[in-house]
A protein has these predicted regions:
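Targeting/processing segments of secretory and organellar proteins
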Residues: 2-3
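Conserved P-loop/Walker A NTP-binding site and adjacent catalytic elements of P-loop NTPases
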Residues: 36, 46-165
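Helicase-associated low-complexity/disordered flanking segments
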Residues: 8-49, 62, 129-133
């Protein structure tokens, strides 16, 4: 669905139906303090897109976000996942399996996505350590058709928790 520049389309899916939603303006970050602390230190708070997305994902509901470039869509998707990994890691440790799969249409975009994951992962890790909590060891990787066999084998033996692929 194409949307005019500057217009936000946000939809909730219940499996069959799609309905536009509105945010009532009242929002608190639904994240672990290490996650919300990184976001607040780095950006001062969420964008409108992120606030609306996180209000939905905090309820474990599916969402489709269409918004202009630079509005925070990628972080809106990934920070919820990072938060869940942090909480699970602290509670019981992270299983050696892929928890988050991001499928990209382009190899170059896959590499950009992974690069953009490094800052929040490092920031959350630092936040955990500053709180006296252990690093939960979230691993991420990119796998494309160009990924060498040795690296693929490493991923098989110790799967990344976040896998970006084409």
């Amino acid at each position: 669905m194409a949307t005019p520049q500057g217009w936000l389309f946000f939809a909730l899916f219940d499996g069959r139906n799609c309905a536009e939603i509105e945010n009532d303006g009242m929002f608190q970050l639904p994240f672990h303090p290490a996650v919300s602390g990184w976001l607040e230190r780095r950006f001062g708070g969420p964008t409108e897109v992120q606030a609306q997305a996180w209000a939905v994902t905090a309820q474990r509901r599916h969402a489709l976000i269409a918004a202009p470039t630079g509005s925070g869509k990628t972080l809106a998707a990934f920070l919820s996942a990072i938060d869940e990994l942090v909480r699970e890691g602290l509670a019981q440790g992270l299983a050696d399996e892929v928890h988050v799969l991001y499928v990209s249409p382009l190899k170059a975009l896959s590499n950009d996505i992974r690069k953009n994951l490094q800052e929040p992962l490092a920031g959350v890790r630092a936040g955990l350590l500053a709180m006296g909590l252990p690093d939960v060891g979230i691993r991420d990787a990119v796998r494309t058709g160009d990924t060498p066999a040795a690296e693929r084998e490493r991923m098989r033996r110790a799967p990344p928790h976040i896998l970006v692929t084409t």
